[in-house]
A protein has these predicted regions:
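Alpha-helical packing segments of well-folded alpha/beta enzyme cores
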Residues: 16-27, 73-84, 130, 161, ...
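Aromatic-lined carbohydrate-recognition surfaces of secreted/lumenal glycan-active proteins
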Residues: 37-41, 68-123, 174-185
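Active-site-adjacent "subsite" loops/lids of carbohydrate-active enzymes
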Residues: 1-26, 30, 125-126
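Aromatic- and acidic-residue-enriched carbohydrate-binding clefts of CAZyme catalytic domains
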Residues: 1-10, 46-72
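Substrate-binding cleft/loops of secretory-pathway carbohydrate-active enzymes
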Residues: 37, 46, 92, 97-144, ...
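Substrate-binding cleft of secreted/luminal carbohydrate-active enzymes
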Residues: 128-153, 171-248
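A structural motif corresponding to the C-terminal end of an alpha-helix
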Residues: 26-34, 76-98, 133, 137-140, ...
Length: 248
């Protein structure tokens, strides 16, 4: 699909799902990788309009809406990658993991009864990424939601989202790691507290479901570009990174 001056792989096409699965299999067969990791790109954040209308007409299932059809397309991609990784592990006696780092909001509670107490963009309906289903189906070994907001962000408060993700993975086989925005301190008034990230790490300890944290990006940690960012990372390094971390 060509849209917004970009070339996008259309997951509504069976050939695309086959291609993505084959690419993952090629990586598994030829490289000694620890994991297959996907970032937060599924359907684009921008509305693609009717760019995939012909594919929808050709492959829709019964009375599916285009929205549920798109979600199912992404589900098929995720399931196929999961199966490819599992097959590789059985055949090669390996323990390669499959994980995803999605946008931090699955759905808002006002639009979906199982959603979080948020008012932001929803990956379920914008990117057609049903991350909650992937966890319930145990298709993921780990998930790293990008919770790139502060405790005081009205539309997406940090604590509400951490609580939601911890509750969502509870009882599943999917391990939860929280994605933190190391690049944000000092970039806006809301991020002017150098203790924000450290407070987030402290809050994480309330939930035994949280196995660890990930930061974006490496550059912000080791080459901070403003005073508040530097203070934020120094606090984490001195208080939280004094000891070796356990390997997931």
């Amino acid at each position: 699909v060509i849209n917004f001056n970009m070339l996008l792989l259309n997951p509504g096409e069976p050939a695309v799902i086959k291609f993505i699965t084959a690419t993952v299999t090629e990586i598994l067969d030829n490289y000694n990788v620890d994991a297959i990791h996907l970032d937060d790109y599924f359907y684009p954040y921008q509305d693609i309009g009717n760019a995939d209308a012909a594919t929808f007409k050709r492959y829709r299932y019964r009375n599916d809406s285009i929205y549920s059809w798109r979600r199912n397309n992404v589900n098929q991609v995720i399931r196929n990658i999961h199966l490819a990784v599992q097959s590789h592990n059985r055949q090669k006696n390996r323990k390669v993991k499959f994980g995803i780092s999605p946008f931090g909001i699955w759905a808002n509670k006002k639009d979906h009864p199982q959603g979080s107490l948020t008012k932001g963009l929803q990956s379920y309906s914008v990117q057609y990424a049903d991350t909650r289903k992937w966890i319930q189906q145990n298709w993921l070994d780990y998930i790293v939601p990008q919770i790139y907001w502060t405790f005081e962000t009205d539309a997406a408060p940090y604590a509400a989202l951490v609580d939601w993700w911890a509750s969502t993975v509870r009882g599943s086989k999917t391990q939860l790691y929280i994605g933190h925005a190391a690049y944000q301190p000092g970039k806006s008034e809301r991020w002017n507290n150098p203790h924000e990230l450290a407070n987030q790490l402290r809050y994480n300890t309330r939930h035994p479901e949280i196995r660890g944290t990930c930061f974006f990006s490496y550059r912000s940690i080791f080459a901070p570009d403003n005073k508040i960012q530097r203070q934020a990372m120094e606090k984490i390094i001195l208080e939280y990174w004094k000891y070796p971390a356990k390997t997931p």
